[in-house]
Design a protein with these regions (language model features):
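Phosphate/nucleotide-binding beta-alpha loop and adjacent structural elements of enzyme active sites
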Residues: 1-191
Length: 191
């Protein structure tokens, strides 16, 4: 598994990309034909809009019912985008979510509710070259529900992280340890 690449980055509230995050990503995928990219926690679609021109297929996951109309409108002109109106986690079911439409800091609050949750593995995606995850601290359940997809496809993984994992008792160190145990290699050290 040493050929699996892992990319970490910090949350970016300014989408002008003055920190060069798009360039950092592109240097790692420039020589690859990107077949499928998965955007987990898409919000209104800033990364989806960036990625759609770099992939044959873009699978977009966003559970926030308040932001979904804007996201759907933003990607509507692109034939390679599929919107999945669900949260992702370690198992299937329903959850309650707290939504902040302005900041994009939506997160799971309870494991009963009206928001559908699935595992990424349940979709049986193949040819996955990049997985972007921005789930406000819920990274470990999302990753555990994507273990087969990750190990089978060996994608670059972009995790947008801050200290929000503390609400679930999850640290960045635990995320790195989990991915390292699956043979992942860290290729950027911005996190």
């Amino acid at each position: 598994g040493g050929n699996i690449a892992l990319f970490f980055m910090t949350v970016q509230k300014d989408f002008s990309d003055k920190n060069g995050n798009y360039d950092i990503l592109l240097k790692h995928v420039a020589d690859r034909q990107l077949r499928r990219i998965i955007d987990v926690g898409a919000w209104w679609g800033p990364w989806s809009l960036f990625w759609q021109s770099h992939a044959e297929k873009l699978e977009i996951f966003e559970p926030n019912k308040k932001i979904l109309p804007m996201l759907a409108q933003n990607i509507s002109k692109f034939n390679n985008c599929t919107l999945h109106k669900t949260a992702l986690g370690e198992s299937k079911g329903t959850v309650s979510m707290a939504y902040d439409t302005h900041s994009g800091t939506n997160h799971v609050t309870d494991f009963k509710g009206d928001t559908e949750i699935n595992t990424l593995d349940s979709y049986s995606f193949d040819n996955v070259d990049v997985i972007k995850i921005d789930v406000e601290g819920y990274e470990i359940p999302v990753l555990k529900g994507a273990k087969h997809t990750i190990i089978t496809n060996q994608p670059i993984i972009q995790i947008e992280g801050n200290s929000s994992g503390q609400r679930y008792g999850i640290s960045k160190k635990q995320i790195m340890e989990l991915l390292t145990s699956w043979g992942m290699t860290r290729i950027e050290k911005k996190w």
